[in-house]
């Protein structure tokens, strides 16, 4: 399996684990240095991000993937993914967003990990 295929599968797995609130997998696929930059500009480190998923501050219901692009350079990669994401976040109502995420990833010991993400709409 190519790195590009592994990373694309990791992206899809990430959404599945967000919907299922699977803390163990979320912890495994995000590097300890991970930071999510929300559309508002808020920076959320890994522990806070996963905690918000688990406590319902970030509620994800479904994700329909519309496409992604992966560029690998050695042991780092960039993934840009577009998905229609149904969620209720930060106390707002349930809504479907056209969410674009740009991820930085690193590879260590043969596995890929998300290190940084920036959210926007498309």
Predicted region positions:
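A beta-strand edge to alpha-helix "cap/lid" segment located at domain peripheries
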Residues: 1-28, 33-122
């Amino acid at each position: 399996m190519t790195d590009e295929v592994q990373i694309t599968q990791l992206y899809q797995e990430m959404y599945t684990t967000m919907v299922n609130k699977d803390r163990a997998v979320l912890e495994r696929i995000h590097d300890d240095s991970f930071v999510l930059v929300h559309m508002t500009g808020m920076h959320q480190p890994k522990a806070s991000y996963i905690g918000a998923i688990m406590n319902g501050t970030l509620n994800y219901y479904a994700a329909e993937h519309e496409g992604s692009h992966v560029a690998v350079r050695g042991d780092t990669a960039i993934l840009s993914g577009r998905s229609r994401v149904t969620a209720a976040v930060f106390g707002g109502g349930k809504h479907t967003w056209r969410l674009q995420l740009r991820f930085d990833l690193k590879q260590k010991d043969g596995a890929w990990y998300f290190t940084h993400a920036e959210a926007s709409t498309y």
